[in-house]
């Protein structure tokens, strides 16, 4: 555990300045991080006409947890992707820091994509129209064979630690270009309009 903390601190250039321990039957970690920012991107800044993007794809954490709990036999490359999504998630911090000046609103997806989209819609007082499911073909094929629900895996999985963000249309080219430079997949999943809720 200590080595894991050390590795994460080195990778994300942060320091542990304190902590407290207690006794219990389960292992629980609560972490709080403080930092400075010259621009804070909130959950509530989206505007009518903004595009909705995610880094991604989604759904592998649901499958990874299913593999761990049920010991399912699937293709090796799909196992690797899914287990990595659960046991070693990688927040897209470089991408977020490089592009936050273009975002009108943003939130991480650790509580699930559906929860994130609904929270951003509520905070912005705007309707979010979702017209694309941010998943990969290999995942879709497997879930279909297993008669598992794609929407549930993608929108209600959680623990992906991806960025969900809105941008004015004029910045689409630059954020896509920056994603390619950093080799980070991003997916346009919808748009913002007048109204309430996620549709």
What do these predicted regions represent?
Residues 1-199:
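Helix-biased detector of long, well-ordered alpha-helical tracts
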């Amino acid at each position: 555990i200590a080595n894991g903390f050390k590795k994460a601190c080195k990778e994300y250039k942060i320091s542990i300045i304190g902590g407290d321990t207690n006794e219990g039957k389960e292992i629980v970690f609560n972490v709080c991080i403080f930092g400075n920012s010259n621009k804070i991107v909130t959950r509530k800044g989206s505007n009518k006409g903004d595009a909705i993007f995610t880094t991604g794809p989604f759904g592998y954490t649901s499958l990874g947890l299913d593999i761990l709990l049920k010991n399912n036999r699937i293709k090796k490359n799909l196992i690797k992707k899914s287990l990595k999504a659960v046991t070693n998630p990688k927040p897209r911090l470089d991408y977020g820091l490089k592009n936050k000046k273009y975002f009108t609103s943003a939130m991480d997806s650790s509580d699930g994509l559906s929860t994130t989209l609904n929270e951003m819609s509520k905070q912005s007082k705007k309707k979010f129209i979702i017209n694309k499911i941010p998943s990969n073909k290999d995942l879709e094929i497997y879930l279909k064979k297993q008669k598992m629900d794609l929407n549930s895996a993608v929108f209600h999985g959680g623990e992906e630690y991806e960025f969900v963000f809105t941008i004015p249309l004029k910045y689409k080219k630059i954020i896509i270009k920056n994603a390619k430079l950093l080799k980070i997949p991003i997916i346009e999943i919808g748009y913002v309009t007048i109204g309430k809720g996620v549709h």
